[in-house]
């Protein structure tokens, strides 16, 4: 669920996700095309690909079960589809944290028109 994903990102990075990631680069937020602008944008590209592989549930809207253990996200629950969504979100939140040093403010609210090169395949 997008609100759960937001909480993961906030706790992992300390950044407000809606401001910092919702419109970052060519792939963060809704849709995506072209080549990812940097490592953070690539996190979003990989997250989009992860969501594409999920079948049987709605990644953006279905709630899943997770907890925090020693600063890490632990996905749980009995529903394999929802657990898969959680794992996609977990991986992206960790990716954002791991790439904070190369995060570039100039890619916030990046115009889609500048993402016109050929899109990569998942």
UniProtKB/Swiss-Prot annotation:
* GO annotation, cellular component aspect: extracellular region
Textual note on the cofactor: Binds 1 Ca(2+) ion per subunit.
EC identifiers of the protein: 3.1.1.4
Q: Show the InterPro entries listed in the entry.
A: PLipase_A2 (IPR001211), PLipase_A2_Asp_AS (IPR033112), PLipase_A2_dom (IPR016090), PLipase_A2_dom_sf (IPR036444), PLipase_A2_His_AS (IPR033113)
Per the UniProt entry, the disulfide pairs are 26-115, 28-44, 43-95, 49-122, 50-88, 57-81, 75-86
Instruction: Give the residues the record marks as binding Ca(2+).
Output: 27, 29, 31, 48
Where expressed (tissues)?
Answer: Expressed by the venom gland.
Q: Where is the active site?
A: 47, 89
One biological process term in Gene Ontology: phospholipid metabolic process
Domain of life from the UniProt record: Eukaryota
Role, per record: Snake venom phospholipase A2 (PLA2) that inhibits neuromuscular transmission by blocking acetylcholine release from the nerve termini. PLA2 catalyzes the calcium-dependent hydrolysis of the 2-acyl groups in 3-sn-phosphoglycerides.
Give the UniProt family note: Belongs to the phospholipase A2 family. Group II subfamily. D49 sub-subfamily.
Q: What is this protein called?
A: Basic phospholipase A2
Q: Organism source for this protein? A: Gloydius blomhoffii
Phylogenetic placement of the source organism = Eukaryota, Metazoa, Chordata, Craniata, Vertebrata
